[in-house]
């Protein structure tokens, strides 16, 4: 989040400003461009841009497209009833179960994952808007690589000699976790 703040606000706050929102008193490039008649947009699957504590990242853009389903985004409330165990098992039930573990039961192939959907939405935006604006600024924020490290086939094992049956997508950031 601090890096995004610096990019959009033209600030050098990365090392000093904590993780958080664009403050109401701060100017940002999306607003300045919009005021000059430049078409602006943001396409992102980054859930923290759209949640409490990360607010105001999208509000000054002329349009925004939030690609749902990554990390802690509560995109789905229940597992897909037809889920057959692919792409991988969700985490066990309990307080530590992530919203992503529910969302991912709805993924069937590469095109269902947030990263590829973000890039597809970007290509669609460019196709739809080509030739319609003299100038535009499109900010594309792809959350990966970031936990969960959940890579769809055929990419997951492209550079491995053998399949790792204990594929961990949520690194155990605690002592004696494995």
Q: What are these model-derived regions, one by one?
A:
Residues 1-178:
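Catalytic domains that recognize anionic headgroups
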